[in-house]
């Protein structure tokens, strides 16, 4: 009987399952190499942890790893129901809150090694967490894509740790009770981007869609479609970073000015940025809450031992 020790949390409604023990040891020299090793040699562990019957499509996994940098607190590899994520803002907040819950860290600045580089997270005395994300930027502006059944849609392509297609003019109602229609619309948009060859820099696939609307209690409300056809319950840390990059490029948000990004569930992140050469360094602040401390069991005789 194999065992996996996990800590579950949610950040703005979006769950994170932090794997503390039980996965195979990884030997790569960088977090990117370790992610690739996990994907190529041990992917069944991701499936067992996140897919039914132990998980669900909404869960985002975070594998706690020893740091690869001398000044880092830890390393992390993020994954979901469909595969692996480059970076995850809400997951980083969940990671830091979980480590505090277990008594492994105290308030202060903690550096974290990820597959796309080192980020830092500040655990504040009041429990809020600010992630200094990877340098972010807008790659292309107002790119047209023909979405079958919906016509031509224009959006910006931006990097915030993942590749996003950001759309403000879409004609959709961004409300929680409209989530099924929004899911189908944004999934069709993702597929249209793929079939029409619209990509991020160097042909990188765009795997997130972000729609925006007005919100009475924030600067903006979003709906974020993630790979695997699950929408983000939080405002999305990497998506908010991509939004900040677009706002900075358009001259609509000054350096250091706060942007309040609401999600479709009403949760909020507070974002700001600092200039970093031709890119920006986003700072995303949010909170996470613990929901479970569990041991997952894998019985080799179970026909669904490694997920459905």
From Swiss-Prot:
Transmembrane segments: none annotated. Substrate binds at residues 89-90, 208, 232, 237-238. It catalyses: trans-4-hydroxy-L-proline = cis-4-hydroxy-D-proline. Keywords: Isomerase. The keyword Translocase does not apply. GO terms for molecular function: 4-hydroxyproline epimerase activity. The keyword Isomerase applies. The active site is at residues 88, 236. Its EC number is 5.1.1.8. PANTHER family: TRANS-3-HYDROXY-L-PROLINE DEHYDRATASE. Catalyzes the reversible epimerization of cis-4-hydroxy-D-proline (c4DHyp) to trans-4-hydroxy-L-proline (t4LHyp). May be involved in a degradation pathway that allows P.putida strain KT2440 to grow on either epimer of 4-hydroxyproline, c4DHyp and t4LHyp, as the sole carbon and nitrogen source. Does not exhibit measureable racemase activity in vitro with any of the 19 natural chiral amino acid enantiomers. Belongs to the proline racemase family. This is 4-hydroxyproline 2-epimerase.
């Amino acid at each position: 009987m194999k065992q996996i020790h996990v800590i579950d949390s949610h950040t703005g409604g979006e769950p994170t399952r932090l794997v503390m023990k039980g996965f195979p040891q990884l030997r790569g020299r960088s977090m990117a190499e370790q992610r690739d090793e996990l994907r190529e040699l041990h992917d069944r562990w991701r499936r067992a942890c996140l897919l039914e019957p132990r998980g669900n499509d909404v869960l985002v996994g975070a594998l706690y790893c020893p740091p690869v940098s001398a000044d880092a607190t830890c390393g992390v590899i993020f994954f979901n129901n469909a595969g692996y994520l480059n970076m995850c803002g809400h997951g980083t907040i969940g990671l830091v809150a979980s480590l505090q819950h277990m008594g492994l860290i105290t308030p202060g600045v903690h550096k974290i090694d990820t597959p796309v580089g080192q980020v830092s997270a500040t655990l504040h005395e009041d429990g809020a967490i600010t992630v200094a994300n990877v340098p972010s930027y807008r790659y292309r502006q107002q790119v047209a894509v023909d979405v079958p059944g919906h016509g031509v849609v224009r959006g910006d392509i931006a990097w915030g740790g993942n590749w996003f297609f950001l759309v403000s003019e879409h004609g959709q109602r961004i409300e929680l009770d409209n989530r099924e229609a929004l899911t189908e619309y944004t999934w069709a948009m993702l597929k249209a981007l793929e079939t029409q060859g619209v990509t991020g820099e160097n042909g990188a696939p765009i795997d997130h869609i972000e729609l925006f609307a007005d919100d009475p209690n924030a600067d903006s409300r979003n709906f974020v479609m993630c790979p695997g056809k699950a929408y983000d319950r939080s405002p999305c840390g990497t998506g908010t970073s991509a939004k900040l990059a677009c706002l900075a490029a358009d001259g609509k948000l000054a350096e250091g000015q706060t942007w309040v990004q609401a999600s479709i569930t009403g949760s909020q992140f507070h974002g700001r940025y600092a200039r970093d050469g031709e890119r920006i360094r986003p700072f995303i602040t949010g909170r996470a809450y613990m929901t479970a401390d569990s041991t997952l069991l894998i019985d080799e005789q179970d026909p669904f031992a490694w997920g459905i």
